[in-house]
UniProtKB/Swiss-Prot annotation:
GO terms for cellular component: cytoplasm. The gene is ENSA. This is Alpha-endosulfine. It is found in: Cytoplasm. The keyword Manganese does not apply. It comes from Gallus gallus (Chicken). The keyword Transferase does not apply.
Amino acid sequence: MAAPLGTGARAEDSGQEKQDSQEKETVIPERAEEAKLKAKYPNLGQKPGGSDFLMKRLQKGQKYFDSGDYNMAKAKMKNKQLPTAGPDKNLVTGDHIPKPQDLPQRKSSLVASKLAG
């Protein structure tokens, strides 16, 4: 009436084999699709760096969108090459609040203003 003790393990093994065969069946159509794509596009995925045209453009160096980009890159290069100046000793660091008496006198301009007329 009761099944022998060893038959339960065999049923689990056959269930595992069915799952493995189902996984293999789902993998086989994927391999077939990959083979079709490789036949259709033989050069796809061979070069990790991209096309020859792209590699040639990258080897030529940086291209600039317009003159503004060029000038900004040029200014960055100049800033990197210049040595940094020492701290200015007359620089006000915020230790005190300036008063009108502490400020230097304003220089008068040589040209008379049209508004002051």
